[in-house]
């Protein structure tokens, strides 16, 4: 339900709502009538993917560079007001539930939008996501203190030897389930979460 090529002509969705949580909610009755029981959304955590590409000038709209694990991506919200993306996301989930669909999220906890090979220097650890707060607790570091890419191939690797990182994931999952109403999760590169 993205405004990207291939989805631009969805019927019955007003142009300003295409690619938004509100637009997706409008599709709920149709998807339920098809007999679907679950909808899985690609990552919806706040991200900086459109600003930080692998190469200068490139963009990435997939959402796999998480910036904030507790915030719905405001780019997918028609309501940009304070709290608007959260309200709109919850309304979308309610619409899917009313149509008999469960909502699963594709979640990315193996890495974040922090530095690494996406930055100007692969040794960079900045203040994009969690770096600078407790970098060694959140990220795997090499002997020189630089971020390691490890098994993710995507910029850095979260440090799940750290209780702080483990708590972040559990708290985030509890939030998305208990507060936002999400029913299940698909974990990107799930084996990385078990590495110590």
Where are these regions (language model features)?
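Substrate-binding/active-site clefts of carbohydrate-active enzymes
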Residues: 2-181, 189-196
């Amino acid at each position: 339900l993205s405004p990207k090529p291939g989805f631009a002509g969805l019927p019955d969705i007003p142009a300003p709502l295409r690619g938004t949580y509100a637009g997706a909610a409008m599709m709920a009755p149709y998807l339920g009538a098809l007999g679907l029981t679950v909808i899985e959304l690609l990552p919806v955590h706040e991200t900086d993917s459109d600003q930080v590409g692998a190469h200068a000038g490139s963009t990435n709209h997939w959402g796999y560079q998480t910036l904030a694990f507790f915030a719905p991506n405001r780019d997918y919200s028609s309501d940009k007001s304070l709290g608007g993306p959260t309200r709109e996301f919850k309304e979308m989930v309610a619409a899917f539930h009313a149509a008999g669909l469960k909502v699963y999220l594709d979640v990315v906890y193996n890495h974040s939008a922090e530095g690494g090979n996406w930055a100007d220097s692969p040794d960079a650890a900045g203040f994009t996501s969690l770096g600078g707060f407790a970098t060694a607790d959140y990220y795997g570091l090499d002997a020189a203190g630089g971020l390691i890419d490890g098994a993710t191939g995507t910029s850095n690797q979260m440090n799940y030897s750290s209780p702080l990182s483990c708590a972040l994931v559990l708290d985030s999952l509890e939030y998305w389930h208990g507060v936002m109403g999400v029913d299940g999760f698909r974990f990107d590169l799930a084996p990385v979460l078990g590495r110590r």
